[in-house]
Each structure stands twice: as structure tokens, then as C-alpha cells.
């Protein structure tokens, strides 16, 4: 797998050079790239653009980018697309390579004021203080397919610096295969490369090879893709963040896309024990875009067992969510995840966990949007659920392992999005969390079973 990692990185560089050489003319009329059009979702949820024609070639997006846009487009309500953010760099001349990104930072006030300043299960705002979460840079050469050019090659590299780096690290990439630090020595701020892949497109097929975001789940580690500052428990504990391997997408029609891929487990590039996993799924969005249905499943020897971290046991997890537009202003998203892992302990028992998340959004006007979220994560064996961040507290006091609390944890969040212009968004929220299990308390430095927080962050796109 070490050889595989270096081949992937070399392939990304080579294909970027090849893509640059292939470029003949700039992509006319681009103000910004549609991969990060959450601003459309934040302002009356614009519909997807019309299908491409022979006279206007389709610029294909990477799979993860297309997934993020589908989330936005499935929340359609206006006939006009929201304005794109102005770009500091944007497209590099005639190369078709785009450089974009954003800054994301915010603060959280915890009603308990824990001495450690850690907010228990909250993420990514896990500190009771200001955090610079993401300096996120995207270097991308999108695919461009038309009748005269049925195939193309591109790629994408994402770089993230900030406190969110720990949620996107991959074993054997940013860390050593055993999980010990390699790129980053601290527990607060660090650098990660959550995506680095080559994209090969032919007609309706799109093959991504390298490291990429998972197709499971509704929320994303990219701040611009989410309504709330804090993330749901499913993304925090159950779902993978990235995979290393290959993912094939078949766009059967404008309504249906199919996915299948082979990966080296989850959040792993080169582990002590490498394992093969399969991911597959689909996205269905009818022409009227009244609703959208996403389903994805992952299976294989994906996670180390509780009994021995060097032994990987069979694990299966699925994620599905339904987006439904009641009107142009009201939208609902319902998500269900479930997972099973065999031989998680010395007795050979099977662990299971599941989650349910419900969202309700209301578009007030072009600048304001309100949202509610209820979140439930149930982990009867305590294989996933836990409190604090990896590492040690100031003064040398160790933090507990991030799992081991059996039971269910729930939260209710209410928030607003204020988008005065396409380049800036403010996300205030209030959140109540409570734990109903029999393990160690999750909040206020493991002394309480509930907590109340107020948080707000700002996103500046460039």
C-alpha cells in the first residue's frame, strides 16, 4: 500500500500536467465553479442547470463535487441560479485548472465552562473558545465532455489547515500506518489533504482514482456544504470521511447516477493491516426535483476490533437520506444510518449501531434561512461513541479514548444562515445535547450527561 500511495500521488501530478497540455481554450463564461454552490442552497435553493448540448459542452464534476451539488440542487425552489462567489484566483489562464477555497472560523460558548475547554461530543467546534477551523484550498481540473470530445482527464487536490484536520486524516498518509503523528505534532492545528485523485471521464462514465470523500451521508467535512456549524453524530462517529482506492460513477440519466468502488477500508491509505472494502450506491432525483433519494453501502474488513487494533473484522454500514421540498421555502431532509461489525471483542460478539437525523429548513428570503436538526446516535456496545479529542490536555493530563460509552446520545440544534453576498456566510446556532447510556458521562469533563452550547462561525470564500 505504500507503493500504491506514491503511485497515486505521482499519478495526480502527471495527470494535472497532461490536462494542462490538453487544454486549448478557456472555459468561457465561468464566474465560479458549480462544485461549491451551497450559496444556491442557502438562497431559495436553485435548481440544477439544464443538460449539456453539443454546442455547449458539459463540464463534468468530480463525484464528490457532484454529490455536494446534488444536495443543493435537490433543494430547488427558484428558477434562477444563485450568483457565484467572486474568486481571488479562479481559472489559471487557458489551463482549465481552477484554484478556489474558503476560510472558516468560529467560537462556542459552553454553559458548563469545562476546565479542559473541551465540548465533549461536539465537532468540529469541540473547544469552548474561538477556533480557526478551515483554511481550505481546492486545485481542480474538471472534466469537460461533449460529442466531439467523448473522453477527458482531470483531477483534484484539496488542502485543509486548521483544527478540523483531525477529522480528515488518513492512516499512512498524514499519519504513520500505526496512527502515530507524521505531518502534525500538535492536537489543535494541523494540515491534511483529504482529496488527491485523478479523474478519467468517458461519455457517461467517470472513474476517480486516489483519495476522495466518501459517498455515505448527508453532511460533509467541507464547511461550505453544511447548514450548521456543528456536525451530526453520524458523521462524527459512524461514517467514514475519506477512502483511498477507485470509484466509478455511471450517469444513466439526468435523474439517476450509480456508484461502485473498491477502497482500502475507511480513512486509511496505508495501515498496519490493509483491507479491501466495497462501496456502492445511487442518487435519484426526478425531473421536477420535488425530492431526491440517496443510498450508499460499504462493506469489508474496515475497522480494527476492540480486542486487538491489528485485527480487522468484517463490517457493513449503509446510509440513506431523502430530501423533500414541500414548497419553495420549506424543505425536509431525513437520514438513517446503520452498521454492524463482527468479532468486535474477544468473545466474538457482533456490535451494532444506528442513527437517525431529521432536518427542517425554511428560506426566509435571499439572505436568511432558518434550520432545525434532531440527531440520535445509538451505540449499544460502545464501539464508536466517546467524548474528547485524541491527544493530551495542557499540563500532560491524558484524554480518554474516543470510544467506549455504550448507549444513546441525542441533540437538538436550531440555527440561522445569513448570506449578505455570495462570498460570505454567517452561521449562528444553539444546541442541546444529552446522553442516556450507562458509560462515563460525556460532558463537562466527564461529569455531566447533558450540555447547552451557543456557537457561531463565518465562512469567507475566495
Residue locations for each model-derived region?
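N-terminal periplasmic/intermembrane-space "pro-region" immediately following the signal or transit peptide
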Residues: 10, 16, 21-120
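Outer-membrane beta-barrel pore domains
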Residues: 30, 121-124, 165-168, 182-186, ...
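Short loop/turn motifs that connect adjacent beta-strands in outer-membrane beta-barrel proteins
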Residues: 83-99, 143-153, 204, 216, ...
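Surface-exposed strand-loop-strand hairpins of Gram-negative outer-membrane beta-barrel proteins
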Residues: 93-96, 108-132, 437-447
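Residues that define the transmembrane beta-barrel architecture of outer-membrane proteins
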Residues: 95, 128-135, 189-194, 203, ...
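Glycine- and aromatic-enriched membrane insertion/assembly motifs of diderm outer-membrane
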Residues: 98, 124-163
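Residues on the lipid-exposed face of transmembrane beta-strands in outer-membrane beta-barrel proteins
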Residues: 101, 132-141, 195-200, 209, ...
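Surface-exposed coil loops of outer-membrane beta-barrel proteins
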Residues: 112-127, 131, 164-284, 292-301, ...
